[in-house]
């Protein structure tokens, strides 16, 4: 049997800089803690006694106006606590923080973006959830660091909480995966580097929003369904961005949440959802687009800015861009 390689051993032998390795280890510790909490949580509970932003005993709303589940708050605090232990981390921005948090480190090297618990709406149905993270250079201040474009990221990844807990980790050149082994109390490397297939047969999207899509996007989707690329596509939709994106990464295909009539800037958040995932897909040979360009090149105006996203295999993503570009050309003719 092949010797197991722990995440710690992998990082020690990798090209990651020492401070990045420490932050990745901290993120992994937080992720394993979230996984343990999820496995033992009474997710159908209607009691919200967790004291989040001074709102003990009630369900507060985050900066997006969304109800905060007690596990959202728990996961957020766990990631913050683990990252705050590392002096190289100058600050963080997450979905559950109204503003970027400054750790007031004396020697900051990095800034971390994260979504502590993606797919919270799935909890009561015991569905799939995840966490997303991106590591960027420290840019001199918390505000400047939190408004860096995704192209500045040096590492990114996500955790998928499923039948097992999976950690996917990318630098600019490769993507590796690790499985949580409770009996060893560590993440263990899988045997292969992840690569996104050039095309697939699965699309993941919210069909209930399609009628709000712009016409060229609707035509593109109809083409997938009708055999545009010489094969039939099937829909798979978990309702958790991490889960749907991971399927596209390993099996090929596409995840789409483009701009529509109800959400001109899409639904997903640029800094801690879109950019880290786009970074992973680029490193794995996949692609991502806002519909008009690379999300990693978008200059954010706000830490909580939203962004349209189509992500997955190159064939499907590029065909979406082509469809929208052709419509723009036709309208301007």
What are these regions (language model features)?
Residues 43-53:
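Membrane-interface helix-loop junction between the first two transmembrane segments
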Residues 1-45, 60-62, 73-333:
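IMPase-like, lithium-sensitive Mg2+-dependent phosphomonoesterase catalytic core
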């Amino acid at each position: 049997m092949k010797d197991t390689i722990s995440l710690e051993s992998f990082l020690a032998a990798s090209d990651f800089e020492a401070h990045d390795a420490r932050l990745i280890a901290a993120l992994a510790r937080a992720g394993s803690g979230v996984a343990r909490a999820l496995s033992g949580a009474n997710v159908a509970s209607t009691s919200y006694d967790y004291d989040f932003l001074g709102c003990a005993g009630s369900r507060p709303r985050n900066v997006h106006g969304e109800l905060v589940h007690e596990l959202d708050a728990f996961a957020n605090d766990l990631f913050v606590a683990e990252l705050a232990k590392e002096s190289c981390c100058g600050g963080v921005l997450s979905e559950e923080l109204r503003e970027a948090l400054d750790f007031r480190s004396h020697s900051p090297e990095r800034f971390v973006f994260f979504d502590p618990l993606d797919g919270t709406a799935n909890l009561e149905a015991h569905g799939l959830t995840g966490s997303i993270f991106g590591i960027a250079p420290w840019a001199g201040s918390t505000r400047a660091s939190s408004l860096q474009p995704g192209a500045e990221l040096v590492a990114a990844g996500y955790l998928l909480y499923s039948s097992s807990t999976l950690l996917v980790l990318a630098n600019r050149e490769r993507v590796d995966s690790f499985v949580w082994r409770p009996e060893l109390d560590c993440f263990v490397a899988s045997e292969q580097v992840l690569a996104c297939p050039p095309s697939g047969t699965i699309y993941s999207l919210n069909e209930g929003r399609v009628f709000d899509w712009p016409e060229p996007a609707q035509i593109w989707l109809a083409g997938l369904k009708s055999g545009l690329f010489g094969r039939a596509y099937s829909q798979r939709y978990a309702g958790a961005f991490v889960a749907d994106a991971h399927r596209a990464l390993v099996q090929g295909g596409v995840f789409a949440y483009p701009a529509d009539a109800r959400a001109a800037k899409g639904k997903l958040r640029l800094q801690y959802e879109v950019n880290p995932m786009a970074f992973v897909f680029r490193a794995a040979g996949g692609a991502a687009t806002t519909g008009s360009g690379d999300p990693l090149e978008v200059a954010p105006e706000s830490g909580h800015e939203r962004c349209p996203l189509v992500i997955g295999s190159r064939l499907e993503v590029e065909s979406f861009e082509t469809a929208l570009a052709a419509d723009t050309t036709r309208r301007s003719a």
